[in-house]
A protein has these predicted regions:
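Short, conserved micro-motifs composed of acidic
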Residues: 87, 226-243, 721-723, 811-854
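Basic, alpha-helical interaction scaffolds
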Residues: 306-349, 779, 840-920, 968-985
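Surface-exposed loop/turn segments and immediately adjacent short secondary-structure elements
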Residues: 402, 417-602, 619, 782
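Conserved pre-motif C helix in the palm subdomain of viral-like polymerases
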Residues: 604-636, 654, 678-681, 730-762, ...
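N-terminal, active-site-proximal structural segment of metallo-dependent hydrolase catalytic domains
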Residues: 1-85
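Surface polyanion/phosphate-binding segment centered on an Asp-His-Pro turn
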Residues: 138-147, 181-182, 205, 243-246, ...
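Extended C-terminal regions of large enzymes
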Residues: 926, 941-1003
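Metal-dependent phosphoesterases centered on the DNase I-like endonuclease/exonuclease/phosphatase
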Residues: 57-102, 163-256, 320, 325
Length: 1003
């Protein structure tokens, strides 16, 4: 008689055969990966593996499979063990545990393991139904509906099952919990004979009790409904020389979300346990579509000799193509250096992708082959009665376990090698490992301006189009009605007449600069480029060009043929200079990433646009910026310090705080006005910028290249990994472009000249200083100094005229005024909202006027009258404590702690200390933070900090000494104050007046 052939549980009535299989396109939606695994205890005594080693494999399995939530059973965890695990994996994992009250380390136990990279554990609610056997969590994933999961570990004794399943529902109702979305875990029971080999039916009473619970909860075995005839098992054992297999581990889902589940997997892991992991992905109905994003070459691959050899070989072919083109000079519209370069970058990406796919591993291919063979064996109808077939399946299962263990071991070895080479070194690898990661934010919806107020767009592709259209249309916002070209040009020229002749270099001065974008300039530009920055659409990082340059240098030293990347880039840049950018090359294309700021999350205007450009584009513009270094000091007045070599933001900050003290001491009444430009870099009109460059006598050789770059500039907007169609950049200077800062400085300089030239603005007249103080700038941050006799309307009219011509716009809502001078004057300005008491109308209510004690943030520092020195420091202390707490979890050595303190404590305090000093009590608090971090909060430190401050060769640690560092900063200020050359800063001269005024008469 032929053995029974299982048919499986039939699908629900009316449901298609693959009711649980999600269409392929659904895999492109945002989804959450959920898994279940019986881990068979805390440690693995059979393999002499410690609990921490085992948990490292659990973490590795979650990381590799991008599992957000893993339900685990037979955890054998108590609070002490969870604390130990947290010390090792607390930055990445969070454990929500339920243990039995007695002997938790020896039996039962269920837990949810949360991947902090994907889910914020603070938002998870926990409810215990049965201690150590049934646990519920409830959480929200992004902005979607809440998800409720039940993790179960059923008793081994099936006679206890009816009571167990009934108690779960009773406890759920008693605790007021809604029906779960999923029930997952080790059920120690199968409902269908097909889920066992040999096939047989389990205890009918236990099955009925489980089915009654499922019916009450509205749940079904979704995987079985999707694959009614497939054999797959999660547990294997050998009993009396008989191999038995069963699908004890399952994920039940509610009927409501069954069609939203996909990518079901039952697979072996490297975790030492006798169970396999079952997992699935859930894509909520409202989840946004997720695009492929953009490709980028990982810098870790650049040390692979095989890959770099292939790229270098393709580079040598490019060199030959460029030489051939130079000799042939065929039609440019067919081929030219720029198109050859674009083809090279495209081939480079293909080479890198192919290499990564190939090196993904022979081991992975072996694993897939074993999985395929196992699936074929499980499909054999004789598996229930043929012991040889079952033995073969068991052998392959063990082989799969061995291969998975090797794969995990190899990954650990690779990571260990990376940490050995790069650990406790302040660079990308170490800092990345110890970074406090947060779940990725998804843009759920955007308000559609083409519909009513309640209209929202949820599709990522259409959201990307909405964002694209917004930024394209923004370029035309605020532009006055069109005038004739002649009138427009005349308006610009009239505005530029404010620039004094002394700021316009002569031809002879300009001829001293090399405007050719030479090989030397490109080399310097590459050297100055910072590694680790995000790439443009081509995916090529700076590190690639640097690595190719190093390989060429090595080839030259060994008298071998190499690929001269610097010469190639110089050739491409020269072609752009002479012929302009070829639009087919995509050279000037960029992509924009909107980053949420504040207010309504569905309004695209509340997102900061971050622009990312190709690195070859930025190398060209960095070389162009280097050409402006020499003449820029004549072109731009010393009042502007933004991104200009040898000019410092700290001098501007010190001047503002010194003027506040000076005005009060000398009873010079007035105001300091902090102006804010709205989207400053995005507003400058190009025709105004070109006229400005021409007025400043910038050679056409330079401006021609810049104009070509902007004429061909296009931007794509990325939303949830989806790239929009490009739009042309017709206004503004591009963020992320090394040249943009200097271009903006030149564009705003006519306004600064206009303010300095205005006779109706007294500004502040300081004895002994010929030029009155009226304006300071750091790029777009504009600070005005006005006397009590000035009128704000005068400033407003000047700004309005310049904005009309330049396209800029000042943000009244962010304008802040600090009254200075006598206390009576300061109070009067705040109460009357008038700078000049004779002003007919008060200031706009949107303008903030700072009263005594109110700190105003200016250029990264805090200034004002009678401002507490605690204003910025408490926040910084909190940030340092949190950051050091994250680092502490990596258990760094003393040497590593020294580097961390240098980076965190030094980095967080350096700017503010130099800008406005550090109070003694803050210094003491920071020393306490350092002491606690070094000695892990030990109340009796083994070595005093004063000994750790000593150099390494003097038995010290060379630890950051905050007091000494602060004294060094003070000495630098003293040095600058004592500088008596013509370059002496105005704040130092004002300080002289204050010192003289404070000195006793006759001294």
């Amino acid at each position: 008689m032929r053995p029974w052939v299982p048919t499986g549980t039939p699908p629900l009535q009316g449901a298609p055969p693959n009711a649980g299989v999600m269409p392929k396109h659904q895999n492109l939606k945002a989804n959450i990966n959920i898994a279940s695994l019986n881990v068979n205890g805390y440690a693995a005594p059979a393999s002499s593996m410690s609990g921490i080693e085992k948990w490292s494999m659990i973490y590795q399995a979650m990381k590799e499979n991008k599992i957000a939530v893993m339900a685990i059973q037979e955890t054998h965890l108590d609070d002490d063990l969870i604390h130990s695990i947290g010390q090792c994996f607390g930055k990445r994992l969070d454990i929500i545990n339920s243990q039995i009250p007695t002997n938790p380390r020896t039996s039962a136990g269920v837990a949810f393991v949360i991947n902090k990279n994907l889910i914020e554990p603070k938002e998870i609610e926990k409810k215990e139904l049965i201690e150590g056997h049934a646990l519920v969590i409830k959480f929200k994933w992004h902005e979607n509906d809440e998800i409720v999961l039940i993790n179960v570990y059923a008793p081994n004794n099936r006679t206890r099952h009816p009571e167990f399943w009934e108690k779960i529902d009773t406890e759920r109702r008693a605790k007021g919990l809604r029906r779960p979305d999923m029930m997952l875990g080790d059920f120690n029971l199968t409902e269908d004979p097909i889920d066992r080999a040999p096939a047989h039916l389990d205890d009918i009473n236990a099955i009925e009790a489980l089915r009654n619970l499922r019916q009450c909860l509205g749940m079904k075995d979704t995987w079985r409904h999707a694959y009614p005839n497939e054999r797959s098992f999660t547990y294997r054992a050998n009993v009396n020389d008989q191999n038995i297999m069963s699908r004890l581990d399952r994920i039940y889902t509610s009927d409501l979300i069954a069609n939203l589940m996909f990518n079901w997997k039952i697979r072996q892991t490297s975790v030492p346990t006798d169970h396999w992991m079952v997992s699935t992905k859930y894509a909520p109905a409202q989840a946004p579509y997720i695009g492929k994003g953009r490709w980028t070459l990982q810098t870790t691959k650049l040390k692979n000799k095989d890959l770099m050899t292939k790229i270098t070989s393709r580079g040598r072919q490019l060199t030959k193509d460029l030489q051939r083109w130079e000799n042939d000079q065929r039609q440019r519209d067919m081929e030219n250096p720029q198109t050859l370069w674009a083809t090279f970058k495209g081939d480079l990406a293909k080479i890198a992708k192919k290499h990564c796919a190939k090196t993904r591993g022979k081991l992975v291919n072996k694993i897939r082959a074993v999985e395929k063979n196992m699936k074929s064996i499980r499909g054999n109808p004789d598996i229930d009665v043929n012991n040889v077939i079952k033995a073969n399946e068991a052998y392959l299962a063990n082989e799969l376990k061995r291969l998975e263990s090797i794969r995990t071991r190899d990954k650990k070895d690779d990571l260990r090698a990376v940490i050995t080479n790069h650990g406790e070194v302040l660079e990308g690898v170490w800092t990345s490992i110890n970074k406090d990661r947060k779940p990725r934010d998804l843009l759920q919806r955007l308000r559609d301006p083409n519909t009513n107020e309640e209209g929202y767009e949820r599709d990522s592709r259409r959201m990307a189009t909405l964002a694209r259209n917004y930024h394209e249309n923004l370029q035309y916002e605020g532009i006055p009605p069109p005038t004739t070209q002649r009138e427009r040009s005349l308006d610009i020229k009239l505005e530029l007449l404010e620039i004094p002749r002394s700021q316009i270099p002569s031809n002879s001065v300009m001829e001293r600069t090399d405007w050719s974008t030479s090989h030397a300039q490109v080399k310097v530009a590459l050297k100055l480029s910072k590694n680790g920055t995000a790439t443009g659409l081509d995916g090529c990082p700076y590190k690639l060009w640097k690595e190719l340059d190093d390989l060429h240098t090595e080839a030259v030293e060994n008298r071998k043929e190499g690929f001269n990347i610097l010469k190639t880039l110089t050739t491409i840049f020269a072609d752009i200079k002479h012929h302009g950018v070829d639009k087919r090359s995509g050279f000037a294309e960029g992509w924009m990433c909107p980053i949420y700021k504040k207010k309504d999350v569905t309004d695209i205007s509340n997102y900061r646009p971050i622009m990312l450009l190709n690195t070859d584009y930025k190398l060209l513009t960095k070389a162009l910026a280097l050409q402006l270094v020499e003449p820029i000091h004549q072109l731009i007045h010393p009042d502007q310090a933004g991104f200009i070599p040898k000019r410092s933001i700290f001098n501007h900050i010190r001047l503002a705080s010194t003027i506040i003290n000076y005005a009060e001491a000398m009873e010079e009444d007035g105001v300091i006005i902090a102006l804010d430009q709205e989207k400053a870099y995005d507003k400058i009109r190009h025709d105004y910028l070109w006229e400005t460059l021409e007025t400043f006598n910038i050679p056409e050789e330079f401006t021609k290249v810049v104009k070509s770059l902007y004429k061909s500039a296009h931007t794509k907007v990325a939303i949830n990994g989806v790239l929009s169609e490009p739009f042309q950049v017709t206004r503004g200077v591009r963020q992320g472009d090394p040249l943009s800062c200097l271009l903006f400085d030149l564009a705003i300089e006519p306004l600064a000249c206009k303010l300095r030239n205005c006779k109706d603005l007294e500004g502040l007249k300081i004895p002994g200083i010929d030029e009155r103080l009226i304006v300071n700038l750091f790029a777009d941050d504009t600070t005005l100094f006005l006397s009590k006799n000035n009128h704000f309307d005068t400033v407003g009219n000047l700004l309005q005229t310049w904005c009309k011509v330049s396209g800029a716009k000042f943000n009244i809502e962010k304008t802040e005024i600090i009254p200075i001078g006598t206390e009576a004057h300061r109070l009067n300005v705040a109460n009357t909202r008038k700078i000049n008491s004779e002003d007919p109308t008060p200031l706009d209510n949107k303008i903030k006027i700072a009263r005594d004690g109110d700190a105003v943030r200016s250029l990264g520092a805090w200034v004002g009258n009678k401002v507490s020195d605690l204003t910025p420091w408490e926040t910084i202390l909190d940030k340092m404590r949190k950051r050091l707490a994250v680092w502490a979890k990596s258990n760094p050595t003393l040497y590593g702690k020294r580097l961390i303190i240098q980076a965190v404590i030094g980095g967080y305090t350096q700017f503010l200390t130099k800008a406005q000093g550090m109070p003694p009590h803050i210094e003491a608090a920071i020393n306490e933070i350092i002491r606690n971090f070094i000695w892990e909060n030990d109340v009796h430190p083994r070595i005093a900090l004063k000994h750790l401050y000593k150099p390494l060769n003097d038995s010290g640690l060379n630890l950051l000494d905050i007091q000494t560092r602060n004294e060094a900063i003070d000495l630098v200020w003293l040095r600058d104050y004592l500088n008596l050359t013509p370059s002496r800063q105005m704040w130092a001269k004002v300080t002289d007046i204050l010192i003289n005024a404070a000195a006793p008469p006759g001294t």
